[in-house]
């Protein structure tokens, strides 16, 4: 969901900074001072030393919950019953990180209880899906890698179809692979086209009971771009289509949908209160859909069969909830719980499945002490200085 800098802007800013560095070196040389270089300690820095949660998944069979950490580039696993004692940091059971893992700007995460595998997709940079065993720790190599389209975000699995579905932001697509696909492998099918209603898709669920796929859309429709790169879906047209800014939505498709398939249902409109919907989860037993509503710090719950401009049947929001820029959401129907991962404050929250209103979470998992500031870094790629306001500008 982060704002992305344009390549030209990044190159321009990079050129400006390089010029400033060269000019500074020349000034130092003229003054007789030795040239700057080497292992220089910065005068000051803005950084976040703590993990920041993005995606989240829960496995009630093996009592595991896992989160993707977009800041320290890791995957973290906890006991499902873990809690932050006395407001302190919750120690994970395992944390996979390091160059061998291929974990980078990681987004959606998925747990496979049967095979005890943790799957995650890298979003803006690595363009891969990483598969690790549950017991992976430290700088562990993945058991398999799959090349996926650039800006993959959400991840869902169908045990009936033995397939994996991945949302792709910039391609306005859902790409579907064999569950055990690896290396560079074409998708089995995809959902994409002007009738599909996908617009900057993020969260996704696959409901095997009703054979449906649901997708959360920000509404930023970029058009069907031509340049798709390796491993991406074909466009079906030689010319890019014009983009549009659409209202956010949740679109639901048949689990067998492919190509330019129309949604079976669409939740969209002012009454829905959708605002930058991120993670999406379904409760097939209670016929409900839950979404992490990042734009207004809430969790919205809709009827599974909702259609059109409809209000949520429940909303979790308010100061007591601790919801702060929610990114991921997971439903544990076995234990009757909703899990929410916060991007805004180094925490994951657990609520009762039927929670509503301004209610406190049952449990909290923390990667930093309460009240620790969060700079909010996602994927900064450039920097500029506003000399008039004396401010540093960072496209995130």
Question: Where do the language-model regions lie?
Answer:
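Residue position within the beta-strands of beta-propeller blades
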Residues: 67, 120-121, 166, 215, ...
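Short loop/turn segments immediately following beta-strands, especially the blade-tip
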Residues: 32, 79-87, 131-138, 176-184, ...
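Structural signal for beta-propeller blades
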Residues: 73-75, 127-129, 172-174, 221-223, ...
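Short, conserved, GDST-rich strand-edge loop motifs in beta-rich repeat architectures
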Residues: 217-245
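A short beta-strand motif characteristic of beta-propeller blades
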Residues: 41-47, 91-100, 141-146, 187-194, ...
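Bacterial N-terminal signal peptides
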Residues: 10-19
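Beta-rich, blade/repeat-based domains predominating
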Residues: 48-62, 99-115, 147-163, 194-211, ...
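Short loop/turn segments immediately following the C-termini of beta-strands
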Residues: 70, 80, 123-124, 169, ...
């Amino acid at each position: 969901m982060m704002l992305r800098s344009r390549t030209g802007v990044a190159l321009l800013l990079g050129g400006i900074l390089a010029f400033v560095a060269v000019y500074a070196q020349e000034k130092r040389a003229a003054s007789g001072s030795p040239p700057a270089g080497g292992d220089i300690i910065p005068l000051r820095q803005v950084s976040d030393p703590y993990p920041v949660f993005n995606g989240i998944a829960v496995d009630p069979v093996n009592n595991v919950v896992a989160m993707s950490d977009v800041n320290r580039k890791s995957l973290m696993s906890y006991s499902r019953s873990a809690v932050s004692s006395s407001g302190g940091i919750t120690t994970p059971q395992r944390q996979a990180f390091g160059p061998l893992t291929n974990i980078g700007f990681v987004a959606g995460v998925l747990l496979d209880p049967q095979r005890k595998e943790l799957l995650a997709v890298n979003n803006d940079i690595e363009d891969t899906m990483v598969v690790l065993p549950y017991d992976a720790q430290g700088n562990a190599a993945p058991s398999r890698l799959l090349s996926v389209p650039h800006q993959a975000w959400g991840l869902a699995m169908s045990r009936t179809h033995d397939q994996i579905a991945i949302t792709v932001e910039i391609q306005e697509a859902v790409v579907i692979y064999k569950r055990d696909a690896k290396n560079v492998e074409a998708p089995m099918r995809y959902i994409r086209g002007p009738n599909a209603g996908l617009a900057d898709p993020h969260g996704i669920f696959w409901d095997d009971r009703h054979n449906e796929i649901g997708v959360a859309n920000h509404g930023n429709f970029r058009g069907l771009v031509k340049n798709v790169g390796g491993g991406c879906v074909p466009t079906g047209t030689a010319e890019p289509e014009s983009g549009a800014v659409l209202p956010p939505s949740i679109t639901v498709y048949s689990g067998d949908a492919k190509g330019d398939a129309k949604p079976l249902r669409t939740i969209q409109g002012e009454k829905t209160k959708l605002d930058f919907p991120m993670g999406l989860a379904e409760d097939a037993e209670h016929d409900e859909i839950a979404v992490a509503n990042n734009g207004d710090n809430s969790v919205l719950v809709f009827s599974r069969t909702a259609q059109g401009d409809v209000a949520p049947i429940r909303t979790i929001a308010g100061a007591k909830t601790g919801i702060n820029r929610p990114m991921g959401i997971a439903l544990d129907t076995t234990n009757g719980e909703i899990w929410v991962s916060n991007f805004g404050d180094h925490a994951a929250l657990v609520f009762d499945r039927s929670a509503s209103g301004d209610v406190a979470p049952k449990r909290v998992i923390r990667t930093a002490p309460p009240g620790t500031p969060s700079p909010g870094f996602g994927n900064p790629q450039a920097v500029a200085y506003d000399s008039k306001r004396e401010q540093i500008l960072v496209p995130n």
